[in-house]
Amino acid sequence: NDRFLMRLIRLKPPSVRQWCHLVLVGFLLGPMITAASCDRPVFVNPLQVLQIGSIERHFRIVYPTNYSANAHNPLVILLHGWGGNEDAFLDQDDLRRTADARGVVLVAPRGLGSGAPDFGNNSWTFSGSDTGVTEAGMPICDAALTPDYRYPSCKASKIAVTTCAWTHCQGQSHTDIDFLVELFVLLETQQCIDPDRMYLMGGSNGGNLVWDVARAPRLSNKLAAVASWIGLPHQSYLAPGKASALPAALLITGTKDTTDPPGAWDDFNVTTTSNQTDRYFYESASATIRAWSAASGCPVGAVATPVAAPPPFDCRAYCPGERQDVPALDCRLEMGHEYREGDAWPLTLDFFLSRHRARGS
């Protein structure tokens, strides 16, 4: 022991150069060490309320198992279909397990409609769905054949111009896009979320709303990528020609879908719903993806190019590149108006997690 103490006494103090090296290493490693884990508490109640004006908006959150170990977790917000709620996607065990394995935070907000004043189906309002008209003021449906789905809020506010309107009209204080912007800001500032890996996915009516991202820079600037499952924009509401900072977009449709029919490959004509008595007018899948590609700055042609994708998908793009880097991807399955989550969800997560928000967006 005495010999050990003598050795300590004889140790030389670090030189100035050695001290500088130690300080530099600490400076470089310090942020990495402190940023390795999450220092923000999780929401105790998975069902949260976000008050916007006089309206309560609800959302449910599911954390991955390793959430607290990471300061920057990827986030996917999931928009349910018409008549759904925050449980529509999150009650699916396989969907949650797949996201958990990839370390993804899932958040599912609830649309409006089930409460006052509509007391009906929850919905998301997107371009044309509340007014019932195209940009040129023409009906978005064949009103002679399509039933009147107008919500009480649409009749009372007189927002609905025609009987083709079919989603809520509670957007006087804020729109659904406003809600999503507020939700992303809340999650980014109060939870351990990577601001460069925030994504938006919608199914059916939720997928319809996704395309309005091109018209909302406040939202598009926050997103690394978006995905729409079996949801298309109404006639005339394609991505503007000079949209700024568009995130990458994935569209998954069913070739046998009669509700939001995608049309044939490279067919840019408007498609028409043909389920029962509904006759709504939508932009085709090819027109939607081609317009998004052009708005992203890609020189597009009239024919989409096949892109390698896992079976049973047939995927094509109007911009050159692989599945991991094209700005817009059109993928189709032989199915009707359904999700086929077992195939669609892994493809969507791969599409999302291979992309980060462009710096400066």
Locate predicted features.
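Active-site rim elements
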Residues: 166-171, 272-280, 332-340
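C-terminal catalytic histidine-bearing segment of alpha/beta-hydrolase fold enzymes
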Residues: 249-252, 258, 282-283, 289-361
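Serine-hydrolase catalytic machinery in alpha/beta-hydrolase-like enzymes
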Residues: 52-63, 70-199, 212, 218
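Bacterial N-terminal signal peptides
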Residues: 21-31
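N-terminal secretory signal peptides that target proteins for export/translocation
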Residues: 1-16
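A domain-start/cap signature at the N-terminus of enzymes
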Residues: 33-75, 87-105, 168, 172-177, ...
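Flexible "cap/lid" loop of the alpha/beta hydrolase fold
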Residues: 232-249, 266-267
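Active-site nucleophile loop of the alpha/beta-hydrolase fold
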Residues: 111, 227-234, 254-257
